[in-house]
Amino acid sequence: MLPAPHTCCRLLQQLLACCLLLPRFLLTVLLLWLLDFPCVRRRVIRGAKEEDPGAPEREDPPLCVSDTNRMCTLESLKAVWYGQKLDFFKSAHLGGGAPNTEVVTLEGQRLCRILDFSKGHRPLVLNFGSCTUPPFMARLQAYQRLAAQRLDFADFLLVYIEEAHPCDGWLSTDAAYQIPTHQCLQDRLRAAQLMLQGAPGCRVVADTMTNASNAAYGAYFERLYVILDGKVVYQGGRGPEGYKIGELRNWLDQYQTRATGNGALVIQV
């Protein structure tokens, strides 16, 4: 018996994704393997200890990975492959419609949709991440400051997704918290409450246990978006290296300057 047409189409999509992603994945594997050599790691990754203690706090501090962390493991490769596949199959694209996926509020645990938080013609900033992602947590206060400074013309929403480095998966000793993989919605909501403690005053919601928002926006490990009038007008790079609060600040500054210009501002990154 021949498989159904939609099954064949899905298999072909998966095969195409594997062919396109495999070269990039293998390069990532090589990089992770090299980073397990301390001499290479110290040369490639600038640790926070190299920064001038008297310098002002940076919005996007350099990546810092302790020598105790293994980079090339089965769990790390599974996480990298998963993130690359999510990015390939995401439905959110610059200039296209914003996926209106379901999320859960922390207060009242009410099911709603992402675009419910969009108000009129104001930009809606989406910040996807989790407490076990060190680069995300290192930039959380910078995001909080930016949100406080731009609330007069933009809205901000933190979306808590699945853990980047769960303690029962790709463990990171640099993570602010040791949290296992979420087994139920309550696990995710408890973790999201920890994030809220680190960013008081920010609006936080949690992705559903189907990970619909994470998949639609290709958000794993962390990612930034701006939605305006139902369209994606800013799409940040995939974290950790593409996750840049400073770049988001520049976009918002340009938008504020040109808000009275011709139409919405769309910036490719």
Curated annotation (Swiss-Prot):
GO terms for biological process, alphabetical: hormone biosynthetic process; thyroid hormone catabolic process
Record-annotated membrane-spanning stretches: 15-35
Enzyme Commission identifier(s): 1.21.99.3
Membrane topology, from the record: Single-pass type II membrane protein
Keywords annotated in UniProt: Cell membrane, Endosome, Membrane, Oxidoreductase, Selenocysteine, Signal-anchor, Thyroid hormones biosynthesis, Transmembrane, Transmembrane helix
Cellular compartment(s): Cell membrane; Endosome membrane
GO molecular function terms noted in the UniProt entry: thyroxine 5'-deiodinase activity; thyroxine 5-deiodinase activity
InterPro entries assigned: Iodothyronine_deiodinase, Iodothyronine_deiodinase_AS, Iodothyronine_deiodinase_I/III
UniProt topological domain (Extracellular) ranges: 36-269
Catalytic activity: 3,3',5'-triiodo-L-thyronine + iodide + A + H(+) = L-thyroxine + AH2; 3,3'-diiodo-L-thyronine + iodide + A + H(+) = 3,3',5-triiodo-L-thyronine + AH2; 3-iodo-L-thyronine + iodide + A + H(+) = 3,5-diiodo-L-thyronine + AH2; L-thyronine + iodide + A + H(+) = 3-iodo-L-thyronine + AH2
Cytoplasmic compartment spans: 1-14
A Gene Ontology cellular-component term: endosome membrane
Positions annotated as active site in the UniProt record: 133
A Pfam family recorded for this sequence: T4_deiodinase
Function: Plays a crucial role in the metabolism of thyroid hormones (TH) and has specific roles in TH activation and inactivation by deiodination. Catalyzes the deiodination of L-thyroxine (T4) to 3,3',5'-triiodothyronine (rT3), 3,5-diiodothyronine (3,5-T2) to 3-monoiodothyronine (3-T1), rT3 to 3',5'-diiodothyronine (3',5'-T2) and 3,3'-diiodothyronine (3,3'-T2) to 3'-monoiodothyronine (3'-T1) via inner-ring deiodination (IRD). Catalyzes the deiodination of 3,5,3'-triiodothyronine (T3) to 3,3'-diiodothyronine (3,3'-T2) via IRD.
Record family assignment: Belongs to the iodothyronine deiodinase family.
Assembly notes: Monomer. Homodimer. May undergo minor heretodimerization with DIO1 and DIO2.
Protein name: Thyroxine 5-deiodinase
Organism: Aquarana catesbeiana (American bullfrog)
Gene from which the chain derives: dio3
